[in-house]
Amino acid sequence: MESNGGGGEVRRVNLVYFLSRSGHVDHPHLLRVHHLSRNGVFLRDVKKWLADARGDAMPDAFSWSCKRRYKNGYVWQDLLDDDLITPISDNEYVLKGSEILLSSPKEDYPNVEKKAWVTRNGGIDAEEKLQKLKLTSEKIQKESPVFCSQRSTATTSTVTEESTTNEEGFVLKKQDPKTVSGQRDGSTENGSGNDVESGRPSVSSTTSSSSYIKNKSYSSVRASHVLRNLMKCGGLDTNDAVLVPLNKSRSGAFGPAWEDERRYQYHQQHNARKSFEGAWSGIKMKETIEFCKPKVAPSKPSMAPLCSQCGKLFKPEKMHSHMKLCRGMKNSSANNDLMTSNNTVKPRQQRCRNIPGNPLGHQRVLTTTLKE
């Protein structure tokens, strides 16, 4: 302990505190400070020390309580800023900080109701969206037959026009022979101009008589076409005059020639492919045969001697047999025989001379050996 000039005591305080977050208690922390106070330690002092050590926002994020004796055990006493903390021992304090929830259960209840209301509205919105989708689909279905009917009416109008032209031609062909004869008489009498004028009333009379038939045929044809277009939705109508079959190009003048050329090219390509495959297979077969052959080690250069007579190689252990069979040896032996025969001593007669002291007086022949 140390004394101060003011009479207070400076004590070293050991502060042990626990932090509890969402029901989980952390490992205890130890904080040692020097405290000068006559009245003890308050919670505001502890918060000041924790703010200096852990940050300004840390102490206010927890609710604090101290550990103290109670009867035969210990309890946690909740504290406020002005409460005095009772030590567990002489200069040791044990505190626990519980994390403060941001929202209380009372505040959560309206949020839950709001979420329920939102989910209900969301469900209502989903139902409204489904209804809107149904309405749009119905509108599309209603509009699409109108489009098809418009298209079908256009097609039926073209069909009816064609039918009218065909029927008019047919009616003109089926005129009465009397009217035709009258027209011919008029043409002979009045010329070409009067012929046209005489023909007009006949055409008008025939058309007026067949108007009922035309209307009836128009109505039947139109009804049949409308029904068919409604069944097809007007999207599958095609103009057969525009369609050109693909076989016409082949049936033309150049069709057979083109087919023959194509077949010839195909056969050429096929034969070339076959020849290439055959050559390639032959090369592969040769390579495989050469690969499968046993590889002979390169022979070492023989050290056998050469015969000086015939120039052939012979083994040293077979020298005698080679000498017997060698032609050069035989030839050399024959030459040696000739040489020996030529080098033999031949008696050579010389001129006789009289040897003095020979009473017989006959001549003595001196023989000398000469070597060639």
From Swiss-Prot:
Membrane topology: Peripheral membrane protein
GO biological process: cell division; plant organ morphogenesis; protein polymerization; regulation of cell division; regulation of root morphogenesis; specification of plant organ axis polarity
Keyword Transferase: no
Species per Swiss-Prot/TrEMBL record: Arabidopsis thaliana
Annotated function: SOSEKI proteins (SOK1-5) locally interpret global polarity cues and can influence cell division orientation to coordinate cell polarization relative to body axes, probably by guiding ANGUSTIFOLIA (AN) polarized localization.
Protein name as catalogued: Protein SOSEKI 1
Notes on the domains: The DIX-like oligomerization domain is required for polymerization, edge localization and biological activity.
Phylogenetic classification of the source organism: Eukaryota, Viridiplantae, Streptophyta, Embryophyta, Tracheophyta
MF terms (GO), sorted A to Z: protein homodimerization activity
Tissue distribution: Expressed during embryogenesis and in roots.
InterPro entries found in the cross-reference section: SOK, SOK_DIX, SOK_magnoliopsida
Region span, DIX-like oligomerization domain: 11-102
Presence of keyword Amino-acid biosynthesis: no
Coiled-coil annotated residue ranges, if any: none
Disordered: annotated span: 146-211, 330-372
Gene: SOK1
Localization terms from the record: Cell membrane
Extra remark beyond the main annotation: 'Soseki' means cornerstone in Japanese.
